[in-house]
Amino acid sequence: MVSLLLISLILTSCKEWDEHYDAGSAVEGSATATIWENITANSNLSQFAALVQKAGYAELLKSTQTVTVWAPLNDTFDYEALMNESNETLRKEFVQNHIARNNYPASGRVETSISMLNLKHLVFEGNGNYTMDGIAVAQPNVASLNGVLHTINGKLQFRSNILESLNNKDFPIDSISDFVHSYDVLRLNESKSTPGPVVDGQLTYLDSVFDDYNLLCQNYAYINREDSNYSMVVPSNEAWTKAMDYIKKCYNYVNFSYFDKPSSKGTNQTQERVTLSPSPEYWNDSISHDKMLTGLFYNNNLFDNKKLMKWAEGEQPQIDSLMTTWYDRIYTEDAEQMLKATTPVKKSNGVMFVTGDSLHLQPWLFWNPIINVEAEFGSNLAAVENGSDRTERVTAETQNPLVPGSVSNQGYVTVSPNTNMSNVELNFYLRGARSTTYVLYGVFVPANITNRFIPQEDIKPNQVQVQIGMNRANGSLPANPTTLTRTDTIGYDDEGKPITKIVNLFTNDPSKVDTVCFGEITFPICYYGMAGSPYLRVLSRVPVGNTEFDRTVRIDRFFLLPKELDAYMKQHPDYKVHY
């Protein structure tokens, strides 16, 4: 049984806890009325009073809690439209947007960012004449028993944050909106609730305050917080569907069997079984959605992400790289391609970049990445037959300057034969392979990588056969691994058609650190996140008595390039791949 590290998920404030605030003392001044009494006594605030009453906030303005209210005068806003809104919308987007806890008088020079009841941050400023979020104050400082009342010449604009904007209908984004909001939950806030008696061993509450949280925000980005600053790439419904169709094909999970230490001799090999709980379908759905979201969130305060705000304002400064909230990077070409196909929309806590009919993210960036296998890592090497392995180190200082190329991670594995007639076998795990088509490459290291004095006649190529052990589509294991072949073009006929040959034995160029293509391989099932994996078998194929090839094999690494990336790199030779 394999356990999945399921995403831990959390929660944004839902019920007002008004009664938990209390004004320490009445505001000094000659006024003896509450804010509510002052509002209802002013005929120019009758529309605002009616909306406050409808939303259920009159009691707050009558209470001893200290608040400041910016009340729009009659006919300076669309009263009828607001009266037709639901109480929930009216409370959050209008009434709470005009009330703040504590006293905020207009006196002298003022420049204050104020957190309103709905947690939106609005700027109150001026010196003699005052504005609230750009709206002129008509009459400041109507002193009241429980705070301050300012009248203003218009409604304060409600600015949605990114999470709230996933609810609106300005764009066709129902798919991602429905998915994100399916993780909205309520949680009791014990510290803000009033404890009651213990009943049947359980603590009850006289006054329960709940917080509403979105469980995805904890794991990806706090797009629900007003004090945060994020960018979110928001796929349209069409873009979401296209991307999810692609992703789900790459994460085709089934129950399967695998060998823990694969080798042709089966020296220490045992067969194990992976059974997915609760089901393979659950894994396909949950992992696919996770991969879909991974590349959509960016903290605007980090690194070159800061330039996203300039993109939102219509500028397009070059971006060296963007870093997601999962610390994955995408670089200049890919980042700018993604952004240029979007419509930026500024929000109270960042920016939404809404896509058109496609999410212009290259699939190998987040969904179907390169699989890199460092040969010198002991955890990657499953088994060696007919020889012994050792890890070698090479740095820029120790590398032979006459050998072009470089060794990744400053290390490689050397496998030496047991006898001068042995052909060695190396078996490697291909962990994390997706259910997709790859082009497999191997990087060979020459014998003189750190020794420039090795005689030239002793620097020979390897000749190897390459096999892949993988499952069938139903998860069963075939009797034998698949032998890879590569189709090479060796010329052209009189009509210009290519003449090809099939290569099943691969050789390297020993004059350099050489990357060799072994051909394509398609995995029917996905191994991402699994204990078991397919394996790569490299078999030295040097005939008896042959002196042309080296029986000692030196491997830097192997990498599986998604077929689309391999083709893209051939069409765009200047494209930079980071792996």
Ranges and model annotations:
Residues 1-14:
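Sec-dependent bacterial lipoprotein signal peptides
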Residues 14-579:
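Mature, structured domains of secreted/extracytosolic soluble proteins
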